[in-house]
Amino acid sequence: MAIFTLTSELHDEKAVASATWDFLKSLRQASTTEWMGEDPYLFMGNDYTEYGTHAIDIIYVRTGGTEGIFKGMLPELSKKSKRPFYLLTSGKSNSLAASMEILSFLRQQGIKGEIIHGKADFIARRIDTLAKVGKARRELNGTQLGIIGKPSDWLIASDVDREKVKETLGISLIDIPMQELLDVMATIPLREVDENPTEENIKKALPGANQIYDALKVIIERHHLQGFTIRCFDLLTAVHNTGCLALARLNAEGIVAGCEGDIPTMLTMKIAQSLVGVTGFQANPSAIDPETGELLFAHCTIPFNMVERYEYDTHFESGIGVGIRGYMKEGPVTIFKTSGDLSRHFIAQGNLVRNQALPGLCRTQQVIQLEDPAIANYFLNDPIGNHHVILPGHHAPLIQSFIEQP
């Protein structure tokens, strides 16, 4: 993250510089984010040549009397970046007053901005959040996500606005025929597996499940994909197997791998991965208690890097192939979903209170207690499709900041 400065010539530069280093030092000390030993703050001073090229660019309004200077710089800065202007203030030398005048001017021009002001720990947290959001948006820009086969027929409310996705996120959606995957599978021999499950039907299905994984790796490399969603139920009839094992592995390897050709959920998973480092558990709400806010989510696959342990079972609906029953660590979780046109978002925090393995449901089952029970009404009154993404940890403020920052 880069720190640029705005300073009036009327102020003594030596005194202002000393106060600047003390202020930035307090922010570094207050930051709780790990930046791999690097100084998170890149001090650029009054050289704005590289403005707009970092995960986040912050203008430190060091003194009053800078309003006119900023107004003169605005046309050039607006060419360099279309993101909001972030004005950092220290509370000294009329810094806050000048920032308020600048922000008011920006609002009059229809330009977004924010004043970052408060105690050192608050400022550090806000800057860390904005930096993570900026880093995520840079990572998403240029991403290619595949749609292998068409969305499943039952996903009647899961259309996507491809132009909006490209414009807003920088993500390109690539259509890949299911037959291409099947053709690749035909060239890949079955291989022995290390696992030795006791159930004979699962033991017989594992080589085929691994073949699906190997073929998907070929498709990913061929089309330069960072993720995909697959019309996985077609595999049941085409090869008498399932993609659950392959998706669990690929998600753990950092490749977004979604089920049922659900494009909005794939986008949700990719956004989540860019922000928190995991793709998430794509799942259906299977039961809801609107009075207590307790929800049951279930699906037949979950990323291996999200669970403490897992078991093999058959795929629930078909009773064939290899499904995954994963057990995630109990504790804080976030439920997230974005719509296909990116106009709506759902974010809720809760706690995973137990994993279960009841018959009659998809194999991985999670019971989640919402922090706010009233939010359960969203699922019954105004849901964004059926699939939602479960993330370990509480991330609502970070995700909300991503949504609010263009």
Each language-model region and where it sits:
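Short hydrophobic beta-strand segments
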Residues: 1-15, 59, 141-150, 381-392
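Conserved, well-structured core segments that form the ligand-binding/active-site neighborhood
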Residues: 103-276
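C-terminal catalytic subdomain
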Residues: 255-357
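N-terminal basic/disordered segments at the start of proteins
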Residues: 1-44, 401
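Short, surface-exposed alpha-helical segments at coil->helix boundaries
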Residues: 17-21, 25, 96-103, 158-163
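Extended hydrophobic packing segments that form well-structured cores
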Residues: 323-406
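Cofactor- and metal-binding active-site motifs of prokaryotic enzymes
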Residues: 30, 38-141, 151-154, 158, ...
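Flexible, glycine/charged-enriched surface loops at secondary-structure junctions
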Residues: 36-38, 176, 231, 278-286
